[in-house]
Amino acid sequence: MIQLTVLYGQPHDPAAFDRHYQQTHAVLAQKIPGLKGYVTNKPAALNPQEPSPYYFIADLYFENLAAMQAALQSPEGQAAAGDLQNFATGGATLVAGEVQVYHPVSFG
């Protein structure tokens, strides 16, 4: 399983970021073929004197590296990537890696 993590920097307008992400970007991302899972979070700063460099984090899961690459090159993947310029005013850093499970997560 491959996890693609998108780290979004602090946006110029957080309310506009939230609105666009929820109403447009998440809808586009959910259409990416081969997507096995998709979760997001807003990280809290662990030290109040040092705010988090990231406003928002998205994790997308794919079966393997080839599936992720194919998904990102698909029309749906390209649409989601192209949408970043419409709301990610604080920048977006993408990293990917093989998932190692030490203790399974249970949502719900």
Regions from the language model: what does each represent?
Residues 1-108:
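Macromolecular interaction modules
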